[in-house]
Swiss-Prot record:
InterPro entries: Polyketide_cyclase/dehydratase, START-like_dom_sf. It comes from Mycobacterium tuberculosis (strain ATCC 25618 / H37Rv). SUPFAM superfamilies: Bet v1-like. It holds the Pfam family Polyketide_cyc2. Transmembrane segments: none annotated. This is Uncharacterized protein Rv0088. One of its GO terms (cellular component) is plasma membrane.
Amino acid sequence: MSVYKHAPSRVRLRQTRSTVVKGRSGSLSWRRVRTGDLGLAVWGGREEYRAVKPGTPGIQPKGDMMTVTVVDAGPGRVSRSVEVAAPAAELFAIVADPRRHRELDGSGTVRGNIKVPAKLVVGSKFSTKMKLFGLPYRITSRVTALKPNELVEWSHPLGHRWRWEFESLSPTLTRVTETFDYHAAGAIKNGLKFYEMTGFAKSNAAGIEATLAKLSDQYARGRA
């Protein structure tokens, strides 16, 4: 998911009929189809979909799958959004239950929960098993904002935050926005450009895109 930390190990694309472009961004390598094809990306050994900003070369959605778009949320924030064919309350319920975060994860890093409260409120803490670069670890996050059916946000021990927002466009369509927010993670880290220099900002952007594309496609498949 883009829910905690993303470090995709590789990305593979099945070409169907368009020109393929190769590239590299930090630790992330990709192959992009310019128009009209479905991209199949492998994130940490799991097949997921990847979408990009409309109007630029990239992997495009197929059928009813919505395009993941870049959101300008300001400095120190990596944000993407997608429209999902589901009610806002249903999508909120998934994110507001940490036990279901593995369902959302497009990065392959989320493993499961160690300790989760029965219901999240501001100040709640939940612990999660993770795996990155083949190494297992655990983190404890704290809920920093919660508004039923509209917003869930939690802070990571390093100081950055993950935020999910749900905008109801109709009873069956929701714009979902996920943001990796590190602008207030600390003066030292920000001064050293820690998240940019380590590649975390770029890898988390890729993980968010994979997660949102996966979520959108799951509901698009359900309607097919």
